[in-house]
């Protein structure tokens, strides 16, 4: 059994080490054979031989562990000599991209803030006055219906648009006012083009009566849409909103078909992007403003993002499918 340790000392690699282990400790190894011989012995001779086997087995196992450690260190040293690593090589780090909605928000803010518009933030939970009454939305208006608005038991509600921020701003400040507000809004809709939670951006400019005209509104809107969509055509249409008078909606030439007609634009060649108008005097009266004029505009951030990212299903923005989000 002395030869087992002598053989172990001559081992130079992992393969030889494993062969030495199996030869000594395997099921058909030397020590297994020695233990089988015990059944042919009796009495003191059997006990003495068993002690001798255990002694050599423990000595071999101790020598094996020492040799194993030495072999591991030796092979690691040899591998490091062969494998050269160039630490100067640049390892590109995969970076994430902005969510389409965040990108759209930032792009909008980058346009308006240099023009002097102040970003205002409001509460998601509002009362009837700020969300409806102050905006010339009477009690019988369909927007107040339980099927369209999320109500709480204490007569509070989740804001259905960002317009309440305009009301709070006018209550807290005096003209001239030049502000934008953006954030989450809530309505009870869920389909390809509607979700219970969505984002809006609204703007408001108020000054002394006569200082703000529709031409000012038209200039701001046209500059913004050309900044955001590039060289698109614009179409203004008269419309109706309770909180503006006169009111208008603005369309852009279809960014998908270039006005040749497609499913997205319903083969009209035009896409609706925002609503706007001169602030209704009823709104100013609710606030307590006198001798002022102003304009307001609003648009859906998801709507703008869908057009720039060419997304057909609005719900894609709120799902965690990285295959979709990483494509932008």
Swiss-Prot record:
Keyword Ligase belongs to the record: yes
GO biological process, one term: phenylalanyl-tRNA aminoacylation
Keywords per UniProt: Aminoacyl-tRNA synthetase, ATP-binding, Cytoplasm, Ligase, Magnesium, Metal-binding, Nucleotide-binding, Protein biosynthesis
Gene: pheS
Assigned GO CC terms: cytoplasm
Cofactor note: Binds 2 magnesium ions per tetramer.
EC assignment: 6.1.1.20
Similarity comment: family membership: Belongs to the class-II aminoacyl-tRNA synthetase family. Phe-tRNA synthetase alpha subunit type 1 subfamily.
InterPro entries named in the record: aa-tRNA-synth_II (IPR006195), aa-tRNA-synth_II/BPL/LPL (IPR045864), Phe-tRNA-synth_IIc_asu (IPR004529), Phe-tRNA_ligase_II_N (IPR004188), Phe_tRNA_ligase_alpha1_bac (IPR022911), Phenylalanyl-tRNA_Synthase (IPR002319), tRNA-bd_arm (IPR010978)
Residues bound to Mg(2+): 245
Catalytic activity: tRNA(Phe) + L-phenylalanine + ATP = L-phenylalanyl-tRNA(Phe) + AMP + diphosphate + H(+)
An MF annotation (GO) of this entry: phenylalanine-tRNA ligase activity
CDD domains: PheRS_alpha_core (cd00496)
Protein name: Phenylalanine--tRNA ligase alpha subunit
Species in which this protein is naturally found: Helicobacter pylori (strain ATCC 700392 / 26695) (Campylobacter pylori)
Main location: cytoplasm
Xref: Pfam families: Phe_tRNA-synt_N (PF02912), tRNA-synt_2d (PF01409)
Assembly notes: Tetramer of two alpha and two beta subunits.
Gene3D superfamilies named among the record's database cross-references: Bira Bifunctional Protein, Domain 2 (3.30.930.10)
Cellular compartment(s): Cytoplasm
């Amino acid at each position: 059994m002395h030869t087992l340790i002598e053989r172990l000392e001559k081992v130079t690699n992992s393969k030889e080490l494993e062969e030495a282990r199996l030869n000594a400790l395997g099921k058909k190894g030397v020590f297994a054979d020695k233990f089988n011989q015990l059944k042919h012995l009796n009495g003191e001779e059997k006990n003495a031989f068993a002690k001798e086997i255990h002694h050599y087995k423990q000595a071999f196992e101790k020598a094996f562990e020492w040799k194993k450690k030495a072999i591991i260190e030796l092979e690691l040293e040899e591998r490091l000599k062969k494998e050269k690593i160039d630490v100067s090589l640049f390892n590109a780090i995969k970076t994430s991209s902005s969510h389409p909605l965040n990108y759209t928000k930032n792009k909008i803010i980058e346009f308006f803030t240099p023009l002097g518009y102040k970003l205002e933030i409001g509460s998601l939970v509002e009362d009837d006055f700020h969300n409806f009454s102050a905006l010339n939305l009477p009690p019988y208006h369909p927007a107040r219906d339980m099927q369209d608005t999320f109500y709480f038991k204490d007569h509070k509600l989740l804001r259905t648009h960002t317009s309440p921020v305009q009301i709070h701003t006018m209550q807290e400040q005096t003209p001239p006012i030049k502000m934008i507000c953006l954030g989450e809004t809530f309505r009870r809709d869920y389909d390809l083009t509607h979700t219970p939670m969505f984002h809006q951006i609204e703007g408001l400019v108020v000054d002394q009566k006569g200082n703000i005209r529709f031409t000012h509104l038209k200039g701001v809107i046209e500059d913004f849409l050309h900044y955001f969509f590039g060289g698109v055509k614009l179409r203004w249409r008269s419309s109706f909103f309770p909180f503006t008078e006169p009111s208008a909606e603005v369309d852009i030439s279809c960014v998908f078909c270039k006005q040749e007609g497609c499913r997205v634009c319903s083969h009209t060649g035009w896409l609706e992007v925002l609503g706007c108008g001169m602030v209704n005097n009823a709104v100013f009266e609710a606030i307590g403003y006198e001798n002022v004029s102003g304009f307001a505009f609003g648009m859906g951030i998801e709507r703008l993002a869908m057009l720039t990212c060419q997304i057909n299903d609005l719900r894609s923005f709120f799902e965690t499918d990285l295959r979709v989000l990483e494509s932008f």
